[in-house]
Amino acid sequence: MRGFPAALSLSSWLLVAYFNHYDQQVGAPVPGWNGARMPERTTLAGRYCTLEPLNADAHAAALLAAYQDAPDDRDWTWLASDRPDTLAQCHEWVAQKVMDPSLVPFAVMDNARGEAVGLVCFMRIDKANGVLEIGHVTWSPRMKNRVTGTEALWLLMRDAFEHGFRRVEWKCDSMNTASRRAAERLGFTYEGRLRQMMVRKGRNRDSEWFSLLDSEWPQADAALRAWLSPENFTADGIQKQPLSHFRARSPA
C-alpha cells in the first residue's frame, strides 16, 4: 500500500503494509518530518505540583529534608545514586544534574507545601528521531501515594508531545517492580528486557523498556486528565476512582 488512509483507527493502521518500488516492505511514511524541538528548562505548572528548572541553591535543602523523611534508603536500591546524607552531598548531587547538558532536569514543587519534594529529568533526547526518555525519577516519601507524582509525569509527557516528540521512553531495573507498575499505570507499553544492560552499584542490571507513542497519547492524556480532575478526589485527597477506571473508559 502506497498511501495512508487518514480515517483508519490506530488498530487498523497497525495492519497496513507499505511496499517500495522493489516490492520490499517498508515502514509507514512520516510526512513533513523535521524533527522535534528541544524541551526547555522552563516552569511547567500543574494544579497540585509545579515543575521548576532544577537549581542546587534553590532546591537542595528541601530535597534533602524530603528524602530524609524515609527511615532508611531502600527506595534508592535500584537508582544510580545513593541517598545524600548531608546538605553538601545533596547540593553536589543536584548540581551534577543541573550541569549535565544531556539532561533537562526539574524539581517537583508541591504546590501546597511550596517546596521541592522530588526531582525528574528528560534524558537521552534525540530530536532528529523524536525520541526522549523520562528518567532520574527520584520521589521522596512526601510524594508517595499522592497525586503530585502522577501529575508531575503527566506534565512531562504533555510537554514532550507538545514539542513534537513521537516516542517517550521509560526504563527501569528489572527488579524495580514499583517503577514497572508506574509505567504500565500511566499507559506505557512494555517492549521487553535488555539483558546485562549495565553494571549498577557493582551488580548486574537488566533493564525493562517501555514506550508511549504520539498516536497513543490522546487516549492516555484523556484518562490522566479525568483522573487528575478535582471531582475525582475527596476533601482529604483520596481518589474516588483509580486511573485504570478512566483508561478503560477512554476511546481507543
Where are these regions (language model features)?
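Serine residues within intrinsically disordered or low-complexity segments
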Residues: 9-12
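GNAT-family acyltransferases
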Residues: 14-146, 159-163, 203-252
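Conserved acetyl-CoA-binding loop-helix of GNAT-fold acetyltransferases
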Residues: 145-158, 181
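Conserved GNAT acetyl-CoA-binding A-motif
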Residues: 162-171
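Conserved beta-strand-loop-alpha-helix junction that forms the acyl-donor binding cleft
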Residues: 170-180
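Conserved active-site tyrosine of GNAT-family acetyltransferases
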Residues: 182-183, 210
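Conserved catalytic-core motifs of GNAT/GCN5-like acyltransferases
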Residues: 189-203
